[in-house]
Amino acid sequence: MRLPQDIIIKPYITEKSNMEIGAGKYTFIVDVKSTKTEIKKAVEALFSVKVLQVNTMNFEGKVKRTGVHEGPRPAWKKAVVKIDTDPKPVEYLAKGGKTVTNNKKYKTSIEEFGVAQ
């Protein structure tokens, strides 16, 4: 099993990704072999947030030239993670018909991005 630090490589900061932070969407560069489930678990473990949705995109490496030599840049994967910005308590019925409320404390933003909601 891989560590969350091995799956999430770094945040992907662009003008578009900064605008999406207000909607609770954060963008990361992730390991090429990672799956959506692994990305979700890694973000929840690293940042203590509740992940609602993960969208991934694969990018092929471009061929670049240096003088007469040609070589490919490495392929990479981008993940857009939507977190729960308004966590609601979960109510369910326990044995005996009692209603139990589960108030898990999750963060509503990722402060490491430097943008507060």
UniProtKB/Swiss-Prot annotation:
InterPro entries according to UniProt: Nucleotide-bd_a/b_plait_sf, Ribosomal_uL23-like, Ribosomal_uL23/eL15/eS24_sf
A single cellular component GO annotation: ribosome
Keyword NAD: no
Keyword Ribosomal protein: yes
A UniProt-annotated Pfam family: Ribosomal_L23
Keyword vocabulary terms for this entry: Ribonucleoprotein, Ribosomal protein, RNA-binding, rRNA-binding
One GO molecular-function entry: structural constituent of ribosome
GO biological process, alphabetically ordered: translation
NCBIfam families according to UniProt: PRK05738.2-4
Role, per record: One of the early assembly proteins it binds 23S rRNA. One of the proteins that surrounds the polypeptide exit tunnel on the outside of the ribosome. Forms the main docking site for trigger factor binding to the ribosome.
PANTHER family named among the record's database cross-references: 60S RIBOSOMAL PROTEIN L23A (PTHR11620)
Subunit structure: Part of the 50S ribosomal subunit. Contacts protein L29, and trigger factor when it is bound to the ribosome.
Family indicated by similarity: Belongs to the universal ribosomal protein uL23 family.
Record's protein name: Large ribosomal subunit protein uL23
The gene coding this protein: rplW
